[in-house]
């Protein structure tokens, strides 16, 4: 059902709960704990999903994370998990998840955040959705995105997806709906994807942990051509263990605790913004300093070493972003006159870029080779994620193309280079920042370093534990009034 069409505030029927005896205590648990309980028969997948649907109904009107809530379908799928003959082998048995509205869920419509077309329901699951379901996960809903997933705030006609930490601010984008759902405790794990930071920016905004895999590690198949190969699928989580399991499922590997490196890591620190004139705020600098101190205390070697992001690499990122709008609009058969004005301009520029042949594979290859040299004597790069607090929660879709891209560039200059390079990049919380909002940092590794990044994130999680859910919506503390 559409999230705006149900009898409850979120589209979930008011009576979805099963009364006082329902297992409300399961809401807010990590995915790994929920799955362990369902595998062992200590928890029913139906009860787990029903409890999360009830929490969704309580908070959704104030967050706006979901376009579709799959109440009946999710409960039926949960019952199938309970009856599964190999339930004890499912790594995500009974775990409620959300899926971003730009990958296919069988039987559901994929809109890519646009009203410029009327697509038919998907005939089959996207490969990453199929892998999540095969692992026992239950899709409770489809999360909101900005039109064509182009922007770093999530809003559209009649909807603004708000940050559970401060509802006056955006949950970021383009996986903003997925991030808001996790931060509000509605699901412990959500699928998203990242073409210029679309997993990492919402994770930073909402105090979550995420990993953008390197090229070819997880099936992409996002839109027409995954933005010329820049976009990758991943998950958003509240713990590193949940992230590691989600990543393993998407990558088609057996979930396992990431192995420790042989010795201390050599960590390079970079704070220089690729966008001239953008500076990191004091809270972001403090978060970096805290992480640097913990890395040194753990025995790692920390050095300053700025990567060289060439003008060609920076331009290559922008041309792929522009071209992606045009190629996706073409592949979806969109009525371009029905696009939001900002997206119409974006796609028009993208058509010119494509016709001029400005998306050049050699640009990405050259930058990857340069970064391979950079990582010859360092294991990991540490950098900021964003320059300051998330953008205000407002109808950005009503503003023009220049206003949107300027706001995006000033807030989020540190993520897109690693998309064009095809390198893995992980974001994790690093303590409270300005106005009580989360602060986060980014780790980037060479090709194939996903496990290294997950291990390092787990080590820092132990040394710098973070609050897993936004305080107002924390299932452990009840549901109060929204901030902002």
List the predicted regions and their residue ranges.
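A short helix-breaking turn/cap at a secondary-structure junction
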Residues: 209-292, 309, 463-484
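Short helix-loop capping/hinge segments that flank enzyme active sites or metal/cofactor-binding pockets
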Residues: 92-112, 264-266, 320-372, 384-388, ...
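A short acidic, glycine-rich active-site loop
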Residues: 117-122, 166-169, 401-413
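Glycine-rich, small-residue loops and helix-cap segments
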Residues: 41, 52, 94, 134, ...
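Acidic/His- and Gly-rich active-site-bordering loop/insert found
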Residues: 74-76, 84-157
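Short glycine/serine-rich loop segments
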Residues: 124-247, 424-431, 437-440
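Acyltransferase
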Residues: 45-50, 82, 282-306, 329-337, ...
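An N-terminal boundary/leader segment
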Residues: 1-75, 290-300, 469-484
């Amino acid at each position: 059902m559409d999230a705006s069409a149900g009898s409850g505030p979120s589209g979930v029927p008011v009576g979805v709960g099963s009364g006082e005896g329902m297992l409300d205590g399961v809401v807010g648990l990590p995915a790994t704990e929920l799955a362990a309980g369902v595998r062992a028969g200590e928890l029913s997948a139906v009860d787990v999903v029903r409890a999360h649907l009830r929490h969704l109904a309580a908070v959704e009107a104030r967050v706006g994370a979901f376009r579709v809530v799959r109440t009946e379908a999710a409960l039926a799928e949960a019952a199938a998990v309970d009856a599964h003959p190999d339930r004890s082998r499912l790594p995500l048995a009974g775990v409620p998840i959300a899926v971003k509205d730009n990958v296919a869920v069988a039987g559901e419509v994929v809109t890519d955040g646009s009203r410029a077309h009327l697509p038919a329901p998907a005939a089959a699951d996207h490969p990453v959705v199929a892998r999540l379901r095969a692992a026992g996960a239950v899709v409770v809903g489809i999360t909101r995105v900005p039109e064509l997933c182009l922007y770093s705030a999530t809003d559209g006609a009649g909807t603004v997806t708000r940050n559970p930490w401060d509802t006056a601010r955006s949950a970021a984008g383009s996986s903003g709906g997925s991030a808001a759902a996790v931060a509000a405790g509605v699901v412990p794990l959500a699928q998203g994807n990242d073409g210029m930071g679309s997993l990492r920016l919402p994770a930073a905004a909402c105090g979550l942990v995420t990993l953008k895999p390197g090229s070819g590690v997880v099936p992409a198949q996002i839109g027409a051509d995954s933005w010329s190969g820049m976009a990758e699928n991943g998950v958003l989580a509240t713990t590193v263990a949940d992230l590691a399991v989600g990543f393993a499922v998407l990558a088609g590997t057996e979930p396992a605790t990431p192995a420790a490196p042989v010795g201390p890591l050599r960590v390079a620190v970079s704070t220089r913004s690729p966008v001239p004139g953008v500076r990191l705020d004091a809270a972001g600098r403090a978060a970096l300093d805290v992480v640097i101190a913990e890395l040194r205390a753990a025995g790692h070697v920390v050095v300053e070493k700025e990567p060289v992001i060439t003008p060609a690499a920076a331009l290559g990122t922008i041309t792929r972003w522009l071209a992606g709008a045009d190629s996706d609009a073409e592949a979806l058969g969109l009525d371009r006159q029905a696009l939001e004005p900002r997206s119409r301009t974006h796609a028009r520029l993208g058509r010119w870029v494509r016709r001029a042949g400005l998306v050049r594979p050699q640009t990405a290859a050259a930058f990857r080779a340069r970064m391979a040299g950079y990582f010859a004597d360092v294991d990991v790069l540490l950098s900021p994620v964003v320059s300051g607090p998330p953008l205000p929660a407002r109808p950005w879709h009503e503003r023009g193309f220049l206003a949107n891209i300027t706001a995006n560039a000033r807030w989020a200059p540190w993520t897109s280079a690693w998309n064009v390079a095809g390198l893995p990049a992980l974001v994790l919380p690093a303590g409270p920042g300005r106005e009580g909002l989360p602060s986060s940092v980014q780790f980037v590794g060479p090709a194939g370093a996903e496990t290294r990044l997950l291990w390092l994130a787990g080590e820092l999680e132990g040394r710098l534990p973070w609050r897993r859910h936004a305080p107002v919506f924390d299932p452990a503390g009840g549901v109060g009034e929204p901030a902002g």
